Design a protein with these regions (language model features):
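A short, gly/pro- and small-residue-rich
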Residues: 48-62
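Short glycine/serine/threonine-rich phosphate/pyrophosphate-binding segments
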Residues: 42-48, 148
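Short glycine-rich anion-binding loops that position phosphate/pyrophosphate groups of nucleotides
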Residues: 40-43, 63
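ATP/NTP phosphate-donor binding region
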Residues: 1-38, 50, 70-98, 118-119
Length: 160
């Protein structure tokens, strides 16, 4: 991958900034034309919280199961190290197929009236008490529906 990307940078085709997953913040993705995520599904889902819905993301599975049974399934990763060069060319030439994936986002209004907006979630969104042992009291409202609950929390999932 680094050879392919270095050649694109040297040829003036792209500008490249690399950031480790542990150091990523929203500001890293402002004004980007493309974000390339190298890793597995967990890497992509954690990074996706910081990327707005208009920025294309190219997932590259760095450790596919075809090479190692303990590798990543790569459900969200449409590219692999072996196909990266041609996949990147397709993206840069506007020939790649874009898949728009739904994301969940919650707005939580506390009893004191404070509004908290969650990060966008690619597949699951868990709302629960910060203390795992404590139950959560909450109301779920949508349209005319208004449900009061007391439980461990609530889990929302996309169909993906």
């Amino acid at each position: 991958l680094s050879q392919v990307l270095d050649a694109k940078v040297e040829g003036g085709e792209v500008r490249l900034d690399m950031v480790a997953r542990e150091q990523v913040c929203r500001a890293d993705f402002i004004g980007r034309d493309l974000v390339i995520v190298l890793g597995g599904d967990g890497t992509l889902t954690s990074i996706s919280h910081n990327i707005d819905s208009t920025t294309p993301v190219m997932g590259v599975n760095s450790h596919p199961r075809e090479m190692d049974p303990d590798g990543s399934f790569g459900f969200f990763m449409d590219s692999e190290v072996s196909t990266f060069r041609e996949n990147l060319e397709a993206v840069l030439n506007g020939e790649a197929i874009e898949n728009a994936l739904p994301r969940l986002q919650a707005t939580i209004t506390s009893t004191s009236g404070n509004r908290i907006v969650s990060d966008p979630a690619l597949n699951d969104l868990l709302i629960a008490n910060t203390h795992q042992y404590a139950p959560s009291k909450y109301r779920v409202q949508r349209g005319d529906m208004d449900l009061k609950q007391l439980s461990s929390g609530i889990l929302f999932s996309t169909f993906v």
